[in-house]
Amino acid sequence: MPSYRSRTTTHGRNMAGARGLWRATGMKDSDFGKPIIAVVNSFTQFVPGHVHLKDLGQMVAREIEAAGGVAKEFNTIAVDDGIAMGHDGMLYSLPSRDLIADSVEYMVNAHCADAMVCISNCDKITPGMLMAALRINIPVVFVSGGPMEAGKVVLKGKEVALDLVDAMVAAADEKYSDEEVLAIEQAACPTCGSCSGMFTANSMNCLTEALGLSLPGNGSTLATHADRKELFLRAGRIVVEMCRRHYEEGDDSVLPRNIATFEAFENAMSLDIAMGGSTNTVLHLLAAAHEAGVDFTMEDIDRLSRRVPCLSKVAPAKSDVHMEDVHRAGGIMAILGELDRAGLLHAHLPTVHSATLGDALNKWDIARTNDPEVQKFFMAAPGGVPTQTAFSQARRWDSLDLDRISGVIRSADHAFSKDGGLAVLSGNVAPDGCIVKTAGVDESILKFSGPAKVFESQDAAVAGILTGQVEAGDVVVIRYEGPKGGPGMQEMLYPTSYLKSKGLGAACALVTDGRFSGGTSGLSIGHVSPEAAEGGTIGLVENGDLINIDIPSRTITLAVADSVLAERRAAMEAKGDAAWQPAKPRPRKVSVALQAYAAMTTSAARGAVRDLSQLKGKG
């Protein structure tokens, strides 16, 4: 029977000093036998997805205390990728994931917490907390801040739904007037919450449902809706129950590593493919699996992508569909239910809220239950009022979207495509693989060939696109933007958005060792591995080289003879210390923190996790 971790600091005569400090935080004699549960919050006023979380940690804390635990809250950092986008701030985004994971580990282990409730939301915060939870392996429940309501604006006499990406595209599109761009900007992000499409934040919060670590509705219930409050309260109650089961009954099944097993990662990736989630989720699932000691690889993702169909298309793949529409169609439980009916789900796995995922689907999948409370839950609608306050409205749709033939969520028999929404490509450009969000690719360019137009930074690519250097038929190559080469593996949302604004969204391809925002659509191929800075073939591509892309065949090929590539590689290696670097120095300040990240990180094909082998024999 495991002992409560917290008793290291609360029991025994020699812990009088520690107990004295605990008393100074408000603990009393009666608290020293209770589980101490960390409420891991991520409130910040910098990020709309986190601006409403300030009081929610204490709300969870009070529920933990009512259930018999002691709650202690702390905050992590949170970077807003949208605000950090398009400048050197984006160098810090992916590294912040590891910083968050480490900070959670430091706080939880330093203070011997028994369990955690992780209150996350945006792009790197959920993955960072997930990595920490699987690393520490104590009972945990995830509850996110929830998605933002979609924006609404009237353009040319017609109301259209909007999100952040629409504002970025419109700003670079000359067909919009300054007044129209301002109207779009003012309406695009109307409320608190994670950006309203199937971008990285919402994708990851949905995947925690499939992993079994969060409650039904976590990924799709709007941040503004009153229904979301119960998710937070229930998380507080459940984590205390899980604590007791583990520490008092010896039940290890509640530990995150026994919930997020290999099969659970298969479930999460299958969901990601079915819903056309962000390509960043590949990076984060690989990293989370690494922390869990689960051998889940790009080969597994490739295998799943060949058999799981695309069951839902949400912005940016379908610009008029947002998370509020997914929720109305039954949320993530409905997509998992369709995967289950198609024989594509491991339904026997445990979750934090139900004995098995199958039990949860029987209760929460609106296609198989007539429970009026469940139906009411998924009818939660946007309020349509700009706000930064959680749970501030209780509006409901008049009906559910139960259409599995042509609705927002479809059955496998009526899938948007038999191929899923994500695919792994490989070839001489990317021997270790690369990722494309097929849900966002126009069918006319699933096969594409064109001459390379090479840029050695995102900034150079943006300038090239905006000044007409990129033409229809080109394959834009952006290199030295990988985990090491950036460093930090910047997102390429501005280049893809500007291609769309120039009418080239379905006329060009973009290939990079960097990554893409969840808001990216088009033939955008990222995570090319090995990256240029590690000697990858992408570093040998020259302007005019023909690149052939064949998504149905899962290939990407540089049409250059092996002998020529060998000559180019030899010439590159002959540069010595200047090899595998941009030909011209970039005006980019790389801080000591970023240099340390670059020294330790691995390729995207491994989730950009740390290479601990570098530590062997040192110190």
Swiss-Prot record:
Its cofactor is [2Fe-2S] cluster; Mg(2+). Homodimer. GO terms for cellular component: cytosol. The modification N6-carboxylysine is found at K124. It comes from Sphingopyxis alaskensis (strain DSM 13593 / LMG 18877 / RB2256) (Sphingomonas alaskensis). Functions in the biosynthesis of branched-chain amino acids. Catalyzes the dehydration of (2R,3R)-2,3-dihydroxy-3-methylpentanoate (2,3-dihydroxy-3-methylvalerate) into 2-oxo-3-methylpentanoate (2-oxo-3-methylvalerate) and of (2R)-2,3-dihydroxy-3-methylbutanoate (2,3-dihydroxyisovalerate) into 2-oxo-3-methylbutanoate (2-oxoisovalerate), the penultimate precursor to L-isoleucine and L-valine, respectively. Binds 1 [2Fe-2S] cluster per subunit. This cluster acts as a Lewis acid cofactor. Its EC number is 4.2.1.9. InterPro entries: Dihydro-acid_dehy_C (IPR042096), DihydroxyA_deHydtase (IPR004404), DiOHA_6PGluconate_deHydtase_CS (IPR020558), ILV_EDD_C (IPR056740), ILV_EDD_N (IPR000581), IlvD/EDD_N (IPR037237). The gene is ilvD. GO terms for biological process: isoleucine biosynthetic process; L-valine biosynthetic process. [2Fe-2S] cluster binds at C122, C195. Belongs to the IlvD/Edd family. It is an enzyme of class 4 (lyase). It catalyses: (2R)-2,3-dihydroxy-3-methylbutanoate = 3-methyl-2-oxobutanoate + H2O; (2R,3R)-2,3-dihydroxy-3-methylpentanoate = (S)-3-methyl-2-oxopentanoate + H2O. Mg(2+) binds at D81, D123, K124, E491. This is Dihydroxy-acid dehydratase. Pathway: Amino-acid biosynthesis; L-isoleucine biosynthesis; L-isoleucine from 2-oxobutanoate: step 3/4; Amino-acid biosynthesis; L-valine biosynthesis; L-valine from pyruvate: step 3/4.
